[in-house]
């Protein structure tokens, strides 16, 4: 893999999830094995529907966990997958929480269920560029998320999430890598 980054996730599973302590141990092993960017959920150690925990004990545990991943040689992306559309103020608040906990990269997924929400999420992407001095990935899910996922890099997001092939297992809203490369090339 040479100098290419390796971004890994180990999220809770919908059924029979092993628990956050086991997921943390798995991710730590992945970091020690050479992953360069480890995804830590924003509600690790205190599950919350919006993936942002605020309990002092859970936040302390997250900070220690993030420190251990960094000591293992990885950078940390903290992610919050919201189940609703969120206004700019809430997105900025969550981003600042991720930064306070030690994340190297902030990842927030909002919802674009309507065209108006899509336009607002695109606007928020630009606001984040000026409001936080930190690498971030802000994108959206939902019926109107496709455009946001394809142009977010041009609005300040530090990366794009893509699928390698278009098959039944891929996340449908993520663009195919070969198509995304063309978009990036034509943007420049």
Which functions belong to the PLM regions below?
Residues 42-188:
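Catalytic alpha/beta core domains of metabolic enzymes, predominantly
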Residues 1-19, 66-81:
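Chitinase-like catalytic core of GlcNAc-active glycosidases
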Residues 1-2, 30-32, 99-100, 131-132:
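Flexible, charged surface loops at secondary-structure boundaries
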Residues 5-55:
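Glycine/small-residue-rich loop that forms an oxyanion/phosphate-binding "nest" at active or ligand-binding sites
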